A protein has these predicted regions:
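Long, low-complexity hydrophobic alpha-helices enriched in A/L/V/I and glycine
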Residues: 163-166, 240-243, 380
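Intrinsically disordered or highly flexible coil/loop and linker segments, enriched in small
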Residues: 47-51, 110, 158-161, 241-242, ...
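Charged, flexible cofactor/metal-binding loops and thiol motifs
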Residues: 127-135, 141-142, 150, 157, ...
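A helix-coil-helix interface module used to build multimeric assemblies
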Residues: 1-212, 224-231, 292, 304-306, ...
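C-terminal catalytic subdomain
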Residues: 312-322, 333-413
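Long, intrinsically disordered low-complexity tandem-repeat segments
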Residues: 465-483
């Protein structure tokens, strides 16, 4: 009689960012991947002519792997495994593979049983299963991340010329544009996406001590044993390993680092949205969700909050993977390997949720251009004080310039009252949109175009197109007075 399944501890009650997005890393999918890894080993033996082909066909049939087109969620080949019994039995050996092998052998014909798990060690199967899980999950992560990046890039181009205040150390610094800020989000996401695309998902097959000795005996030759890991990887839908990685854990740490970078990039987006959406700033707002239980007037940045919750947790999880890798002693690790499993799964889980929420956030984000321009004028023209310094210090000296900025009253009127600035177009020099530098060019992806001799010319062309050279550096002596330092 089947045992009672284990009580579900975590359905997302305390992890709303992952709710509805973590099926691909659930225990069911991990179990599915474990079974697929065991079946892939039998298939690899058959591909090399070591095991009869009919054995591989029969094993695939028993566990449903010959049914094409069915999603793992609907057609888990592990559906006949007593999960409760498996979980309970996993404690004794420290991993689920040991009891799983016995359960799988019970389901196949007697002549197939010797080929289940033959020559492999538990780590071969579990590492391979985690790579299967990771590859599936990362396809979804990549899809959602790409959408978020594309939407951020669209925002950048749409608002390339819309002026805003750049803030450094929380304070207004110089003018920028809304688009330049969105381009920063897009570049971070695109860099993370490139890292995801570069990932490898190698299978693991090296035997008990990483020497493949058992496979030499089983296959009858060093050549067959050397070819077996690649055949195993093909059958599992993974990359061929270049060598055993039982204790060289780069596939795990590189995957973890890519996930942390993804969540870093999304965390930056979410942090900016949460800050810029404050009532007193109001430059952006989320287009979905965000109600308050006690204050109906509030529109909480719920998407940004959820994304930030994931981003704040990710670095510590990534650090755990590196710590485990550094403590992967001998030829098989004791405990460090085990620490990776839930850590990697949680990173994948957070990335699945955060990327989906980021795609929604970027797709529905509303920009209040008027609020951004209004905020840029809050300091009464002092947002362009960097520019003013280059213009006025040669005329009135640094002490008087400092007094001018520190004084009360309308800055434009104070400038017009200066005899030394009689020929100055005050409105033009105080216009923040006339001192955005290359922000529109950056927003339109100028910095991301192909490198080469044409980049400077393109920058100059874009600057001229947007009127950025109307009051150029030479006219006001900005470089001479160190404004660009």
């Amino acid at each position: 009689m089947p045992s009672e399944p284990p009580t579900v501890v975590d359905v997302g009650l305390l992890s709303p960012v992952t709710v509805g997005h973590d099926l691909l890393v659930s225990d069911g999918f991990v179990l599915d991947a474990l079974v697929r890894a065991e079946c892939a080993l039998v298939a690899a033996y058959a591909d090399l002519g070591v095991a009869p082909r009919r054995v591989a066909v029969e094993v695939d049939h028993v566990f449903g792997l010959d049914e094409r087109g069915g999603s793992p969620a609907r057609n888990l080949p592990a559906r006949n495994v007593d999960v409760g019994a498996l979980v309970a039995a996993s404690v004794a050996g420290g991993n689920p593979v040991i009891p799983l092998v016995g359960m799988l052998k019970e389901q196949v014909p007697a002549d197939c049983r010797p080929w289940i798990h033959r020559g492999a060690t538990s780590q071969d199967i579990l590492d391979t299963a985690l790579m299967i899980v990771a590859r599936r999950a990362m396809e979804q992560v990549r899809s959602s991340l790409r959408i978020a990046g594309e939407r951020a890039r669209e925002l950048a181009v749409t608002h390339a010329d819309d002026v805003a205040a750049a803030r450094t150390l929380t304070q207004h610094a110089v003018p920028t544009t809304v688009g330049a800020r969105a381009a920063t989000w897009a570049r971070g996401i695109e860099r993370a996406l490139a890292r995801v695309d570069a990932l490898a998902y190698p299978a693991q097959l090296a035997g008990a001590g990483g020497t493949l000795a058992s496979f030499v005996e089983i296959t009858g030759s060093h050549e067959n044993a050397a070819a077996l890991p690649a055949a195993f990887a093909r059958a599992a839908g993974l990359d061929a390993p270049d060598a055993p990685w039982h204790v060289t854990r780069w596939p795990i740490t590189e995957l973890g680092d890519a996930l942390v970078q993804v969540l870093d990039a999304l965390g930056k987006l979410a942090a900016d949205v949460a800050t810029l959406g404050r009532t007193e700033i109001g430059e952006v707002s989320e287009g979905v969700g965000g109600g308050s239980s006690a204050m109906p007037q509030k529109q909480n940045p719920a998407e940004a909050v959820l994304i930030r919750s994931a981003a704040l947790r990710a670095p510590q999880l990534g650090a755990t993977l590196h710590l485990a890798a550094s403590l992967a002693i001998d030829e098989r690790p004791d405990g460090a390997w085990h620490a990776e499993w839930p850590t990697l799964r949680e990173l994948l889980r957070l990335a699945l949720g955060a990327t989906r929420h980021a795609a929604l956030l970027a797709s529905h984000l509303r920009v209040d251009v008027a609020a951004a321009r209004r905020n840029a004028g809050l300091t009464g023209g002092r947002l362009v004080s960097e520019r003013l310094r280059g213009v006025l210090v040669p005329l009135i000296g640094a002490p008087r310039f400092a007094e001018l900025l520190a004084g009360d009253g309308d800055l434009a009127e104070r400038l017009r009252a200066l005899p030394e600035a009689a020929g100055l177009d005050v409105d033009a020099v105080l216009d923040p949109s006339a001192y955005v530098g290359l922000a529109p060019w950056l927003a339109r992806g100028g910095a991301d175009r192909e490198a080469g001799g044409g980049r400077a010319e393109r920058a100059a062309s874009d600057a001229h197109e947007h009127g950025l050279d109307e009051h150029g550096p030479d006219e006001h002596g900005l470089h001479e007075h160190g404004v660009d330092e």
